[in-house]
């Protein structure tokens, strides 16, 4: 949830999976051509939060079909497991923290973003001093904190939703309703 002590460390852990610089483990799957696309991030609300990881199976042009959802899920879980096991370099942590601080500085230059920041602080009942000291809070997060939250939250407790394109049923037509259509006035 918003304001949870693990929220920022978890944001960094999720950035180790997917980030704008494409240095995450899911980004590597995309760059290596093992999946078509993928992403990871957090959604935080006042009383609960979610970690979302989405991946699109690789489309094989020659066979004109996608790779199986099972193989895509397996590759994705392996990428997540690397982070959960603490298999990441220290420089990535520092780069992600610096990028988060840079984005905060850019956000503080935009009036609309400042308004959104204040609004979020208000409805999540967060201390404004703590919200404005975001950069100090981010830089204080240690690698051990990130390993701890990654191990705690990136585990086997997940729901996998597989979405596939359905096939049209041939020969079935919808019957017309048994009432007269409404005629528009002229």
Residue ranges: model-predicted function:
Residues 22, 27, 129-186:
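Proteolytic maturation boundary segments
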Residues 1, 27-139, 160-164, 172-173:
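M16 family metallopeptidases and their MPP-like homologs
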Residues 12, 39-40, 148-149:
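Short beta-alpha junctions and helix-cap segments that line functional grooves
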